[in-house]
A protein has these predicted regions:
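Active-site region of glycoside hydrolase catalytic domains
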Residues: 1-308
């Protein structure tokens, strides 16, 4: 029904990165609610068609990890982040209802969306068959060290980000590389969402100036991308072995793709696009490796352990 629905209110109505470039938490909540309502309506219309197939929603899940698991304030910070950025779409889409904790949080801030009682019936009766998961990075949060000052509701009043020591970073994006997050997502869906079928619809890394990794024959030797994929697949494989219902894995992206925010600055593809020369697309090393991965339905790690 939607791809990354939370991005619209988050980036357009909270953090001013996307159109309409406003900072209004109440509008953000109303927009998010209407997106969920539209998604549920799409599910309803699909059911009316009695067509073969299934229908789902694609969510960009970012597991929230608190700095100190033994600190109640840090725990509350990560819970607030999870409620606002993950469960706000995951729960109504899969369970047909909003988390009571989220409703209380919004009510406490006087930002509950306007709604009709029949809307809630619509959401309850039209849940999805599967979930698509876009996973790139976690959120590392703690309770605020100083009060957050704003004349409108902003989720940031409940938390602040921090960077863990010795974490792996994709410096091109400023995103932490934390492959275990994909496992945690799978276990969460297994334990808290009825083990709903799901697939990884996006996973990958955008890297700037990949020309520096090009060999004399013009192939990008992107071993860093191969390592990224392997590490995530190993954790995904573990989630499946432990009963997770993941049925597929897609990369973002097959080709270097154009971004709304930075054009071709960060390259995500397994296949290189040379926009300067308008040349024929060329395989990167990762493309050859991924083809072998697909043909063999797995790979053998350096330690000889199979991942299939």
């Amino acid at each position: 029904t939607f791809n990354e629905p939370v991005v619209i209110p988050e980036q357009g109505y909270l953090y001013q990165h996307h159109y309409p470039l406003v900072r209004d938490g109440k509008r953000a909540i109303q927009v998010a609610y209407h997106i969920q309502l539209a998604s549920s309506m799409a599910v309803r219309e699909f059911r009316k068609m009695n067509s073969p197939g299934q229908i789902g929603i694609v969510t960009n899940l970012t597991p929230a990890y608190c700095q100190d698991p033994d600190n109640t304030e840090d725990q509350n910070a990560s819970q607030a982040v999870d409620l606002i950025f993950n469960r706000s779409f995951l729960d109504p889409s899969v369970k047909g209802e909003y988390p009571r904790e989220l409703v209380s949080l919004l009510k406490d801030n006087s930002v509950l969306p306007s709604y009709h009682s029949e809307d809630l019936d619509l959401i309850r009766d039209n849940t999805v068959d599967f979930v698509g998961v876009n996973y790139y990075h976690p959120r590392r949060v703690r309770h605020r060290q100083a009060p957050f000052v704003s004349n409108v509701f902003m989720p940031d009043k409940y938390f602040e980000y921090y960077v863990p020591e010795n974490c792996r970073m994709n410096i091109s994006r400023g995103w932490e590389i934390y492959e275990k997050g994909i496992y945690d997502i799978g276990i969460n869906l297994r334990d808290n969402y009825g083990n709903i079928p799901w697939m990884v619809t996006e996973n990958g890394m955008g890297v700037q100036d990949e020309e520096q990794f090009m060999d004399k024959d013009g192939m990008v030797q992107d071993d860093y991308r191969i390592t990224f994929i392997k590490d995530h697949l190993k954790w995904l494989h573990r989630a499946i072995q432990e009963g997770g219902a993941c049925f597929g894995y897609h990369m973002w992206s097959p080709f270097d793709s154009w971004s709304w925010s930075n054009a071709y600055k960060n390259r995500y593809g397994l296949i290189r696009i040379d926009i300067a020369k308008e040349a024929k697309p060329t395989y990167k090393k990762s493309a050859q490796w991924f083809r072998q991965l697909s043909d063999q339905n797995g790979f053998t790690d350096k330690d000889g352990a199979p991942c299939k």
